[in-house]
């Protein structure tokens, strides 16, 4: 699918039918999503594919979001690794046979002290922007497979790790509902491009 067409076909779909989504198709979409760029190529994301615990995840959500989570075939909970120094060293460890020596040194020695100097706000902003980039890649990848999705920001992040049994070092960022739908969405209004461009 051409990129313009792909973007025009991507919509926030909020109702889903009963047609099953093949897990392998979702896994492929996530694999494609991880080709997204990330600052320092740190890839801080963690995808938790939720099916059995959807009902628990839906508790306490605003009604519209609750219905989506219950109807979706899967919910992808996107987390970010808050221990960036550890993440950096993990990339070096796993990639040791593929990465040149200078990059191994970069991940093992250069980046960890840089991340250690981040304050809480800097870490939060760093993680949020990387999460947004990979989430957009995921919904476009799903759209390319004709699978519907929606990004949910309105959920109780304080309970998500406990429900899904995820190490608290991983910060919940957003939920993505995944399924097939009978919705026939209309294109959302977009501001004219000249309203969002300035030249200097």
Swiss-Prot record:
SUPFAM superfamilies: FMN-dependent nitroreductase-like. Keywords: Flavoprotein, FMN, NAD, NADP, Oxidoreductase. Disulfide bonds: none annotated. GO terms for molecular function: oxidoreductase activity. Its EC number is 1.-.-.-. Gene3D superfamilies: NADH Oxidase. PANTHER family: NAD(P)H NITROREDUCTASE YDGI-RELATED, NADH DEHYDROGENASE_NAD(P)H NITROREDUCTASE XCC3605-RELATED. This is Putative NAD(P)H nitroreductase Spy0809. It comes from Streptococcus pyogenes serotype M6 (strain ATCC BAA-946 / MGAS10394).
């Amino acid at each position: 699918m051409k990129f313009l067409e792909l973007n025009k076909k991507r919509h926030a779909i909020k109702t889903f039918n009963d047609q099953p989504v093949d897990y392998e198709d979702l896994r492929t979409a996530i694999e494609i999503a991880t080709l997204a760029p990330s600052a320092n190529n740190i890839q801080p994301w963690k995808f938790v594919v939720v099916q059995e615990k959807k009902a628990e995840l839906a508790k306490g959500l605003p009604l519209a979001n609750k219905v989506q989570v219950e109807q979706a075939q899967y919910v992808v909970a996107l987390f970010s690794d808050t221990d960036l120094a550890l993440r950096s060293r993990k990339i070096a460890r796993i990639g040791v046979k593929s990465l040149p020596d200078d990059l191994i040194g970069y991940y093992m020695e250069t980046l960890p002290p840089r991340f250690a100097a981040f304050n809480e706000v800097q870490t939060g902003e760093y993680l949020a922007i990387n999460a947004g980039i990979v989430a957009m890649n995921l919904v476009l990848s799903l759209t390319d497979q004709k699978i519907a999705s929606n990004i949910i920001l309105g959920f109780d992040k304080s309970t998500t790790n406990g429900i899904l049994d995820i190490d608290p070092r991983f910060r919940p960022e957003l939920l993505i509902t995944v399924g097939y739908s009978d919705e026939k969405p209309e294109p959302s209004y977009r501001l004219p491009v000249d309203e969002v461009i300035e030249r200097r």
